[in-house]
Amino acid sequence: MGFNSIFKFRKTSLSLLLFAVYFIIGILYFIDKTRYKHSLPIDSEGVALLDNAWLDLQNITNKCHPYSSKENDRVHDYLLNRIADIINKTSYAEVSDDYSTNSRALFKQQDVFNASSIASRIIYFESSNILVKMEGRNPVLKSLLLSAHYDSTPSSHGVTDDGKGIVSLLALLEHFSKVQPERTLVFNFNNNEEFGLLGATIFFEHEWSKNVEYFINLEGTGIGGKAVLFRTTDTSTAKIYQNSVKNSPFGNSIYQQGFYNRYIGSETDYKVYENKGLRGWDIAFYKPRNLYHTIEDSIGHSSKPALWHMLHTSLQLSKYIAELDNISLGETQDLSPAVYFDLAGYTFVAIPSTKLFWINIALLIIMPIISIFLFSIVKKYNNEIIDSGNIWWRLPISAMSSGTIIIFTTKLIMKWNPYILSRNFLLPLIGLTFEFIILNSYILTMFENLSSSFDFKTIAINEISFLFWIVLAYQTWKLYDNNYQNTGIYPFTICYIVMATAGNIGYLFLIFKNIEIVEDEEASLVQYVSNEQSTIEGRYRDEINGRDDSSRDSNSASIPTRANDERAPLLTNSVDNINQRTILKESKLVYNYDWIIEFLLVVPFSTFLLYNSLELIMDAVNQTIQETGDLYKVYKILAIGSILISIPTLPFAYKIGCQLGKTLTFISIGCLLISMALAPFTEMNPIKFRFMQVNDKVEISGVTTHDNNKLRDMINNLPSVKRDDKKVQCQEITKFSSVCEYEGSPVHLVDNMYRDKLKLMEVIVLKDDRLSPERSPYAPITAEVEIRVQENRMCNVYFGQNKERIREVNVSIIEGNDRNSSVSLRYRVNNNRNGIDELQLHKLRFEANSYIVGIKWMPEILMSNEEEDDVLPIKVECYWGEYEESSVEVGEGEVGGGAVIEYYDKIPSYSEILEYKPVDVVIANREKGLVKLTEAMVL
């Protein structure tokens, strides 16, 4: 009797089990997020590798080191020396330094950060990549490339992006310098990833690239946590990761689909290697993004456990690949996209997306057939159970009503505290999830009070199964339509399997319960009884008439009443007059424990899977609202996700007990109220503004806060703005972002021996034969422009009207007036319709102070040709990104005095903002540099 009472479908039993499920999910989540922190190496090699890597990280990242800075050269030299020390006694290792070999190229490149862009871009790039080749014991095997970039953004020390990747490569180099690998390894310590993935692109100009087949790219798009397998090229490479990374695997193909479908706007060197036909892995830190590309991406915000997770993951993977031959890696390669995920960091699953497609097809056909077959049997023998009252409409009405309230609550949060998700998305997620569950519990309980049902949970499970069938059918079609690249749909497959299986099991139990239905002429109460028909009829009549006959025999004690029946409504124990049939007979052969099987099938794993998937997505996108300002997309994910997490619980929601219901209600209200009241930005979770000084104007952009004054208030509080009474002008960029502009302080970008006489940038036309009488009207127009810049590495040239008629550009870099100091590189346009929109210039030598750009374009061939028809407007923009060192300026002293030496901040306006900004604000660069000087002209 006690056993039966515990495991029957009662409020207490259900509540305890549901609480246990939520508690276990919370524990698993906590373990998954923190276990890596307690997994530091204990073996001597691992300890040494980590200690050396941490010291390297400290040495590399003590200052910002973008490609445009002199500090970038210091990092290059440090790496070159460290590599030389590591491989000093390694006979099978060889170094190639692009800086020393003057590696450079002029090539066409699509905008790597905007896949929809159709702009024709030509890139001139001088490389300072450092390459190391470790010859394998078997030279026949294709090489493995290990890659990371050592440049940072101008506003960041680059600890995670990508210092950890670089020092992990040094650690791998140290490991393989002691044991020669079977397969040749090529290390690419590349430069200038941040503004075009250029170091990875020019790698393919090197002879060592010709034998490479596999690659591992190490990257950072957040500043800590665990290093995730963002994406991998195919199923075979996913299985290699599965077979090699046994300690703390972490990856999910949901992120891979995000890249495939361009939900993730940024890019890494992985894209370059993949486009060149290599096969490999993109391993990266991905959160938090609010400190990413800021001065806070520093040692102080990093940790050895985070570094070790990337280092150890890449070590496991590279050792596995390096020691296996092609046969061991698999002669039959599956090149289809992979579906993969880890289970709380304990194991890793990988299957082909094509296989998932056929699994889905089979499920979409077979499962409905089984369900329809079982349903028809239930309908034939126990039709009254599944056809009773409004049982089929309860869940849709309840879910839609609750969903409407969830949407309203979500909009309320977005209105009152829109950027709370940037700080904490778990609070609103938990609040909305429990709100949806409790609302459904109240509504479904009300339905049960009005019209008691025999087995609502089975009907509800099958309704949810049908919903997942529709979703899965659509996602399967999208999977096929997108060339099997929708690799993040596997949660719907798994949820449909468990829902359909549980629903069919419920139908089986209904079949074998052998329930008979007869009419009760005096009342229409539903009562579930044993075989004592006459006893029950008498008892029900007594209840209806308000009598309690205690003289019945002892058998009546085993008959369930409204007070203790597991199918009794939640809100009341009273007996209502309900117009429906009375169930009078149920076989004792099947006990009412089927709910446990259905619950364990439906709730625990589905809830954990859906929560884990949503948490991964929100972890990646919650702080992108500061970059894109797209609040609607992120809140839409939050609302839909909270509903999805709740769905597995809905069939059992009407049995949630009073105490658990109150607890969930209290938690929900508390989380939602805190979400609306909590400050969205703190010192550890700051708001990010982006800085750029364009000529003499400072432009700072950022998201629009609730009071719309944070950006303006910060600028108005700057000493220079108050002292000089500078006018601050702000305008809206999008609905959720704005840009403010004010007069900046003069920059001091270079050491100046002749104060006020040195021009930082000057554009001079050396040649232009557009109006020359010696040129035939049908001949191409040629022009040559010199861009004179001081201590500069990066300029862009934009072409305006008639840019589609440009047929050729050539670039040379000269030092002083020596035109023979550089060989010109030429690029010809083959497609007559495209022309050239933009020419990007990236040079290494600071002392080479001139870019010479030659341009050739076709004239407009018309009968009445006006002079203006053939003009070519150009705009030149040059960038500087170094600010931490002071500049020295020398001027004349007073009459009869000597020279006056003064020290200045290179970019005073930027230094001022870093000094006086609020603690809950961080600053990032807006473009390639912190300062941009521009000049326009017409050729």
Curated annotation (Swiss-Prot):
Top EC class per UniProt? hydrolase
Location of the protein in the cell: Vacuole membrane
Question: Where is the site described as Transition state stabilizer found in this chain?
Answer: Y292
Q: Where on this protein are sugars attached?
A: N59, N88, N114, N326, N622, N810, N820
Q: Which InterPro entries match?
A: Fxna-like_M28_dom, M28_fam, Peptidase_M28, PFF1_C, PFF1_TM
CDD domains from the xrefs?
A: M28_Fxna_like
Where does the chain bind Zn(2+) 1?
A: H149, D161, E219
Q: List the disulfide bonds.
A: none
Q: Which Gene3D superfamilies match?
A: Zn peptidases (3.40.630.10)
User: What does the note under cofactor report?
Assistant: Binds 2 Zn(2+) ions per subunit.
Which residues face the membrane's Vacuolar side?
33-356, 410-424, 475-491, 610-636, 685-939
Protein name as it appears in the record: Vacuolar membrane protease
